[in-house]
Amino acid sequence: GGFEIANSCRFDNLDGGSIIDYLTRTPSGASNRKTFTISYWMKRSALQGPTNNTLQQVIGQQASGYFRLTLGSNEQGDILRFYGGDGFEFRSKLFVRDTSAWYHIVLAMDTTQGTASNRAKLYVNGVQQTEFYTENYPGQNVDQAWNIAALHKIAAGTSSGPFCGYLAQVVNIDGAALAPTSFGEFDEDSGIWKPIDVSEL
């Protein structure tokens, strides 16, 4: 019983380096660029992109500045990598290599916070990530290149960096940095992190 996500989107981007499947959104105007939350469920179907050693961009905006949520296949393996303005960069030590598993990713941004470590928080399956290869936080009150009047992409970046896999319940919260419990919960019996209804957010 309980809530279940009805459908997911499959992105099959392994055809010789070309981006085949992706979604786009271009806001009519800018909104909150300091405080927002991005949440999505992800299941990988390939550990490499169409070429070796590429970033698979899951969600991002590169038309005006850049803000990218990616998967990196590099010397550090398949890890979560995030890039933004003012030197913001996370390279998590958590490996996401299991192509049979769903991962729930939450990135909560609030650059208005006085404490640097509160300006960006990364959660995977309900657990805040605190171990990073690279851990650089943005400056206070710095606008990010997100929620701007420019092309935002889901499952695509540059021609060599599309995402290969499934995405479900992709959510962008404008103006609030939310905890993962706004999007999921631990099952009382199994202890597994699972989705909840987000239609009221």
PLM ranges: what are they?
Residues G1-G16, S39-Q48, G65-N141:
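Extracellular glycan-interaction surfaces
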Residues G1-N7, L14-S18, G114-A116, K121, ...:
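Extended recognition patches within non-cytosolic domains
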Residues D12-F36, F88-V96, G157-S159, K194-E200:
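Short surface loop/edge beta-strand patches of beta-sandwich-type extracellular domains
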Residues K34, Q48-L55, Q76, G114-N118, ...:
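Short loop/turn segments at connectors of secondary-structure elements within structured domains
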Residues K34-S45, Q169-N172:
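Beta-rich globular "head" domains
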Residues I38-S39, G49-G65, L122, A155, ...:
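Aromatic-rich beta-strand patches that line glycan-recognition/binding surfaces
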Residues Q61-L71, P195-L201:
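Short, intrinsically disordered, charge-balanced linker/junction segments flanking boundaries
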Residues F88, D143-L167:
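Extracellular glycan-interaction patches encoded by glycine-rich segments
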